[in-house]
Curated annotation (Swiss-Prot):
GO MF term (any one): RNA binding
Region (Disordered) location: 1-90
UniProt site positions, description: Important for dimerization and for HRAS activation: 511
Gene: GRB7
Summary of subunit composition and partner proteins: Homodimer. Interacts (via SH2 domain) with EGFR, ERBB2, ERBB3 (when phosphorylated), ERBB4 (when phosphorylated), EPHB1, INSR, FGFR1, PDGFRA (tyrosine phosphorylated) and PDGFRB (tyrosine phosphorylated). Interacts (via SH2 domain) with TEK/TIE2 (tyrosine phosphorylated). Interacts with SHC1. Interacts with RND1. Interacts (when tyrosine phosphorylated) with FHL2 and HAX1. Interacts (via SH2 domain) with RET and PTK2/FAK1. Interacts (when not phosphorylated) with ELAVL1.
Biological source species: Bos taurus
SUPFAM superfamilies noted in UniProt: PH domain-like, SH2 domain, Ubiquitin-like
Compartments it resides in: Cytoplasm; Cell projection; Cell junction, Focal adhesion; Cell membrane
Chain ranges of the SH2 domain: 431-527
Function: Adapter protein that interacts with the cytoplasmic domain of numerous receptor kinases and modulates down-stream signaling. Promotes activation of down-stream protein kinases, including STAT3, AKT1, MAPK1 and/or MAPK3. Promotes activation of HRAS. Plays a role in signal transduction in response to EGF. Plays a role in the regulation of cell proliferation and cell migration. Plays a role in the assembly and stability of RNA stress granules. Binds to the 5'UTR of target mRNA molecules and represses translation of target mRNA species, when not phosphorylated.
Descriptive protein name: Growth factor receptor-bound protein 7
Length: 532
């Protein structure tokens, strides 16, 4: 028995597979349909255009009630969506409008923090001035912001013109990075130091001196004024990528980047290996180099590319033999990257803090230790003391006069109360840090800049009744013991076995701010901490 199959199911024609528009399913074919034996030819089908479909959808949507879109940022264009956008500002890391407020959290050295609302383009100098006013601190050019990454043990002082919001935008999300508000006495020390102390002759390439006929001092002065960029060279210990071994190489810092020679001190391009780009990176100080990175010395620094957000991979680690070499390399990196802008920041700082309020020209030269002279005011007119022995004798006489004045002050009707008040007056001073360790005092001074004359006073851990004066000189921290002594019922303090005695620590500090005494330099800057 044969079963008859309908030609509709056996045909391979496209017309049989696709029903005509408007024909319901199950409708038999028309009477004028060709037989199965005839050759069927394809016919054009009506395909609705996209515009027609959009119009039909609009008509259907207008007939339905409007439902609010719960995710408008997903439906907005990529240039306006904070999720679909490609830039950092579009991803929500920074507000798109520079005039919009931006909240930053700033920490102090004692661990306290404070949230400050500033404009998105606020610079580090503007934020510092705001924090100085709110903390009622003494305004000077030494305040600064420091970018800290505790996980990586990296620190970097922000320049005055840098935007704080842009710096925070490059941080990893959910990390422990922070901004710290503290003193930075070494920020512009490169413009105050002599050329030989900043960059020794062995660190500056001699080819530029021979080509221009300029002296070493002129080359460094042009370098500081961003007039020229000499080649900085010297030995550095660096660690290879993914390796734990440190090797000593001769490195060159140029405008094009940092290089090291694979063959001694050769400058042949065949022997130079590219390390990092200065303009696309930031240089940081490594605080725990031995513990975290296995550095052979404590004087390490790191070059971190701007595109690197987190992790140790991609960091270029270096270390020097001493603190002076590290300071020279850090200063060279800053000058190569920021150039004339760094010098402008320094000039603006001088105009802000040295010009008188009524206006006028700044002083022709800054007051330093070299411009201070000993004076004799015993007669009717002042006289400059040129003899060093006579100057030392005048300093000792001044110390004796201070002691007599203090003895007269203490000879009041209540000497016991006056003595106790004089003995505890140092606790109200910003340079007194209480009972901190020797290592902590060195860390505080190192963080605020290893400049000559930076000091603090702390309680001695070995001698319960004594104190210690920690002083920075030639980028090294030295400690001087202050011992108390009692004579005729009165308490005195001395650092030279009683040769020069003071009734309290405040008198001792004020005396050595004007006279060196047994110290290698004057007490110029006090290491202080401010709570926000």
């Amino acid at each position: 028995m044969e079963l008859g199959l309908s030609p509709l199911h056996l045909s391979s024609s496209p017309e049989d597979l696709y029903l005509a528009s408007g024909t319901p399913p199950g409708t038999p074919p028309p009477l004028d349909a060709p037989l199965s034996g005839e050759v069927k030819r394809s016919q054009p089908l009506p395909i609705p255009t996209s515009r027609k479909l959009l119009r039909e959808e609009e008509l259907q949507s207008t007939s339905l009630p409007s439902i609010p879109n719960p995710f408008p940022e997903l439906c907005s264009p990529s240039s306006q969506s904070p999720i679909l956008g490609g830039s950092s500002s579009a991803r929500g890391l920074l507000p798109r409008d520079t005039s919009c407020p931006h909240v930053i959290k700033v920490y102090s050295e004692d661990g306290t923090c404070r949230s400050v609302e500033v404009a998105t383009g606020a610079t580090a100098r503007y934020v510092c001035e705001m924090l100085v006013q709110r903390s009622h601190a003494l305004s000077d050019e030494n305040w600064g912001l420091v970018e800290c990454h505790p996980y990586l043990a990296l620190e970097r002082a922000l320049e005055d013109h840098e935007s704080v919001a842009e710096v925070q935008a490059a941080w990893p999300i959910g990390g422990d990075s922070r901004i710290v508000f503290r003193k930075n006495f070494a920020k512009y020390e490169l413009f105050k130091s002599t050329p030989h102390s900043l960059f020794p002759e062995k660190m500056v390439s001699s080819c530029l001196d021979a080509h221009t006929g300029m002296s070493h001092e002129d080359v460094i002065q042009n370098f500081l004024n961003a007039g020229s960029f000499p080649e900085i060279q010297g030995f550095l210990q660096l660690r290879g990528s993914g390796r734990k071994l440190w090797k000593r190489f001769f490195c060159f810092l140029r405008r094009s980047g940092l290089y090291y020679s694979t063959k001694g001190t050769s400058k042949d391009p065949r022997h130079l290996q590219y390390v990092a780009d200065v303009n696309e990176s930031n240089v940081y100080v490594v605080t725990q180099g031995r513990k975290l990175y296995g550095m052979p010395t404590d004087f390490g620094f790191c070059i971190k590319p701007n595109k690197l957000r987190n992790g140790h991979k991609g960091l270029r680690l270096f270390c020097t033999e001493d603190e002076r070499s590290r300071s020279c390399w850090l200063a060279a990196f800053r000058l190569f990257k920021f150039g004339v802008q760094l010098y402008k920041n320094y000039q603006q700082t001088l105009c802000r803090h040295m010009c008188p309020p009524c206006g006028g020209s700044p002083p022709s030269r800054s007051v330093s230790d070299d411009t201070l002279v000993a004076m004799d005011f015993s007669g009717h007119a002042g006289r400059v003391i040129e003899n060093p022995r006579e100057a030392l004798s005048a300093a000792l006489e001044e110390a004796q006069a201070w002691r007599k004045k203090t003895n007269h002050r203490l000879s009041l009707p209540t000497p016991s109360s006056g003595t106790s008040l004089s003995a505890a007056i140092h606790r109200t001073q910003p340079w007194f840090h209480g009972r901190i360790s020797r290592e902590e005092s060195q860390r505080l001074i190192r963080q605020q800049g290893l400049v000559d004359g930076l000091f603090l006073v702390r309680e001695s851990q070995r001698n319960p009744q004594g104190f210690v004066l920690s002083l920075c000189h030639v980028q090294k921290v030295k400690h001087y013991l202050i011992l108390p002594s009692e004579e005729e019922g009165r308490l005195y303090f001395s650092m030279d076995d009683g040769l020069t005695r003071f009734t309290d620590l405040l008198q001792l500090v004020e005396f050595h701010q004007l006279n060196r005494g047994i110290l290698p330099c004057l007490l110029r800057y006090c290491c202080t901490r401010v709570a926000l």
